[in-house]
Amino acid sequence: MKKNLMLIFGGVSFEHEISLRSAYGIYSSLLKLDKYNVFSIFVDKVTGIWYLLDSVPSSAELIKRHTTSIVNFIPGCGIFVNNKSLEIDVIFPIIHGRTGEDGAIQGFVKMMDIPCVGAGILGSAISINKYFCKVLLKSFNIPVVSFIGFKKDDYILNKEGIKEDINNKLNYPVIVKPSVLGSSIGINVAYNVSQIEKYIEEAFEYDLTVVVEKFIKAREIECAVIGNDQIKIFTPGEIVVQDFIFYDYDAKYSTVPGDSIVFNIPAHLDMKHLLDIKEYAFLTYKYLELRGMARIDFLISKDTNLLYVNEVNTIPGFTDISMFAKMCEHDGLSYESLVDKLITLAFESYKKRKDKIDFTRLES
């Protein structure tokens, strides 16, 4: 008997359009698997209203024709469309960035008591926050590039002091990032003090906390990880960027892989770097209490050859050019099998949590 799966995509997020592309890929795979009854839920970018669609269209323009049935949720009671209850066995969120990767939707699904694909509340919330993620990884002696972080209110009160810290502790050039955002949105490289204020202000347009890191010329390595208690680390891949300073939003989603961008799977690594990447991927996954899946990004300095953990993505891209599925496929796990495995992991994680915690014993 087929399981009822709810695929949630879109979202009130700067990465809304990327989510649509990822959802289309996953939906197509679910149809090929023919193991699940798929309920496609589109979350409007402006209103945040949830709509039940007949399918996941291949383009954003087609969605508007189908957004008629509004989805309502009542924790403890169920999910409803047109006053009819939907019996959902598992939820697959593919909302990138805010509300999707920050623990919000994970908390909601937990309240609904439904298995959920991917990381839980804690792992999601920490991983998406670049500042706290780096602080935590550094505390476990996992190498990260030198950085400082600050909130908007603190910057307003002590702008010159923070700019002085950037100059003294990091030295230029530096890379300026919104703390909670993905897909390289709002990220800029500042080469001198005259640029830093402009880029900090731009980053604050996306988030209330900004992270400034020492910019290094680096190789960009990505590593796919799946699993719960037992994890599998796939062969790392490398993104070789020719015409961009780093792998920014335009490079990721506005450029067709070719001369400007080359995906090398496997990445050309010496044995030490390969082993270190797999070790740090394992430790990062463990310390952040991740489950389901993650893409862990690394930097290898072209000057010093030193390795750093850069960022952690708990809902990596599933578009036709995304590295996560490509790395899995290189090691023999097809796109469809990957999607199916992630759903299985969601059921396993849910069952373990339910078996481990017996709330009835607290009753008097």
UniProtKB/Swiss-Prot annotation:
Mg(2+) 1 binds at residues 297, 311. Its cofactor is Mg(2+); Mn(2+). It is found in: Cytoplasm. GO terms for molecular function: ATP binding; D-alanine-D-alanine ligase activity; metal ion binding. Its main location: cytoplasm. Its EC number is 6.3.2.4. It catalyses: 2 D-alanine + ATP = D-alanyl-D-alanine + ADP + phosphate + H(+). Binds 2 magnesium or manganese ions per subunit. It comes from the Bacteria. The keyword Cell membrane does not apply. HAMAP family: Dala_Dala_lig. NCBIfam families: D_ala_D_alaTIGR (TIGR01205), PRK01966.1-4 (NF002528), PRK14570.1 (NF011168). This is D-alanine--D-alanine ligase. The gene is ddl.
